[in-house]
């Protein structure tokens, strides 16, 4: 009996041709695994496609709730954004997909797992670090690092010779990754950062110039940093993100066109659509501005930077990320309230924040007289706060330039 390998399968170009390749080159029995992270497409047809491509069995795992609850919301609460733009939609999904890959491999008694990430990208690292963290005994096969196929055109030719249909053409070889948090676009004409993305690239989001001429107000309610309702309607985590994707996409929210620094050492250009995630990130920051004290907020901003790097680099299942999550959860104990935003032609504007834990005291902030703040006290504060500067100026000796 042949040994088994579990393949992270999407039905796209790369994983479609990996099934016959694994059988031809390793002699493995191939078990395909599809993780439903909210791709927005019907996944059942992949059963027939995987079997026709040579798979012995296929699992289709609905992990949308787990994805949002255990991965997206912790990232949102941390405020993790990579290089000021990227809301980590692909990055944060990979550890969950790899986790399911390991679980099915253990269930099936497989000796190996395989993925379709290329040898130039970040995903190979994210998949494999997760596998190493969860089951280091599993062999990892990355065909893109082994086979003779060197381009997407070669891959298309390989598929056509074996009668495998793929949703890619040689004229427009965009690489897309979609889940309920975002949609990414890479490859083709997008590889030239001097070229504006064609309008037909956008699938979730209206171009801002085609968005409605009237703004729309949206109210989001948070409890301990997690969104729970939109416009007063309580929603499940998955329903909430789908709802905000619809609203944000209509108004051209969440389009990020960026050149990023890949973990593997090169720069790459990608176009990301994250309408709901962009609204949530904005609203969450607004609420934190009302409920977090200055020192906690500033330190949390440093944590957010590191948290984003850990996610981007595939280090989700690490002691450091788990420790940072514990810190973040502590900061979120008072991040409860409602945030009202205005959506208009690609922009989000704050339109009101309320919280039972608000640290904003109007009497302190006003420029008028009050009984809580004596403006004369400021002189002593400035003298003490500025003492190091004064001492340095008094003791500094002239030096030659």
From Swiss-Prot:
Catalytic activity: L-citrulline + L-aspartate + ATP = 2-(N(omega)-L-arginino)succinate + AMP + diphosphate + H(+)
A Pfam family per the record: Arginosuc_synth
Main location per the UniProt record: cytoplasm
Binding site for ATP: 8-16, 35, 116
Gene3D superfamilies with a match to the protein in the record: Argininosuccinate synthetase, chain A, domain 2, HUPs, Single helix bin
Enzyme class, spelled out: ligase
UniProt xrefs under InterPro entries: Arginosuc_syn_C, Arginosuc_syn_N, Arginosuc_synth, Arginosuc_synth_CS, Arginosuc_synth_type_1_subfam, AS_cat/multimer_dom_body, Rossmann-like_a/b/a_fold
Stated family: Belongs to the argininosuccinate synthase family. Type 1 subfamily.
Name under which the protein is recorded: Argininosuccinate synthase
Species in which this protein is naturally found: Carboxydothermus hydrogenoformans (strain ATCC BAA-161 / DSM 6008 / Z-2901)
